[in-house]
Swiss-Prot record:
EC number: 7.1.1.-
Domain of life assignment: Bacteria
Pfam families named among the record's database cross-references: Complex1_49kDa (PF00346)
Keywords, ordered alphabetically: Cell inner membrane, Cell membrane, Membrane, NAD, Quinone, Translocase, Transport, Ubiquinone
Name listed for the protein in its UniProt record: NADH-quinone oxidoreductase subunit D
Amino acid sequence: MAEVNVRNFNINFGPQHPAAHGVLRMVLELDGEVVERVDPHIGLLHRGTEKLMETKTYLQAGPYLDRLDYVAPMNQEHAFVLAIEKLLGVEVPKRGQLIRVLFSEIGRILNHLLNVTTQAMDVGALTPPLWGFEQRERLMIFYERACGARLHANYFRPGGVHQDLPESLVEDIGNFIDPFLIALGKLDALITPNRIFKQRNVDIGVVSIDEAWARGFSGVMIRGAGVPWDLRKSQPYECYDEMEFDIPVGKNSDCYDRYLIRMEEMRQSAKIMRQCVDRLLSTEKNEPVSSLDRKIVPPKRCEMKSSMEALIHHFKLYTEGFRTPPGEVYVAVEAPKGEFGVYLVSDGTNKPYRVKLRAPGFAHLQAMDFLTRGHMLADATAILGSIDIVFGEVDR
């Protein structure tokens, strides 16, 4: 009997699929149930963020950063304000640095809780999201108490943070850590030894160290390949060089390793949070939270009620903004998903000439074809869950 040429089967995955993690559309080419090719279609959440930021003053551009990786908003703001401070040569007081580090680590836990639990849900486990989101809700309340917003914070400002934390909030964050570690242990015991979860993740989506470097991987994706590359250690910023924490690395470079690294990173983040809380309540208790350079930091409201100059200063700062010296800087932070970078070009005016945002998820999604080729169709959802995609930052 003559051999019949069977054409490969093309299907659409998303953009309405619950496992697509946002508005991802992937065109999958299948040979039976084996994936031959993956073509991710992006741009469904493109809002022209970089261009919009060039039309706003440095203070007005800040909130756009919250809308990129909206799972952990303050981590993006961190990179932008560090870039502005590098241009201006401004030093942030130690208390301001500690508050920034504290909320960056809260953001990391927010991100990893969402990712780990939804990764488990993608392969059929329904309990982890219910447990994980209970802890996330507590952290969102800390966000709300710090700046008034649960999601779009706009809390990190050039020169420091918008306002000091009440002592009761710092104490409550400290009291949150131990119960959280117990809850994390229960989540760990539920997912990690689970036979089905292992079968769906072990030896799936393997990437070598050389391939990971060549494809621009960062964060958990590069550490999963066995490289201890973490910007908090390798290029320390703020007061990370004064913190004690470890960097978990994988050895098999598969989806299961990436899950284990995220679980351990949450424990390390809790460790950093505890160190920040201890210092905020003792040695750095009554220190300022923002730079004393009043060119970029607005005056206090109590000053504005009595001083005409303070009122004029406040008005000028929020209408015209401040000017930065001409130049260009690139600043990267270790965001929960990887290296989030801001390339800022200033022409000496009160608005950035060019802002380029380097989103880690973009490089990771590009590798989807390479990671999924040769796997089964069902493995595509497991791989997508493990690379941790949020479309706000991919599409920008």
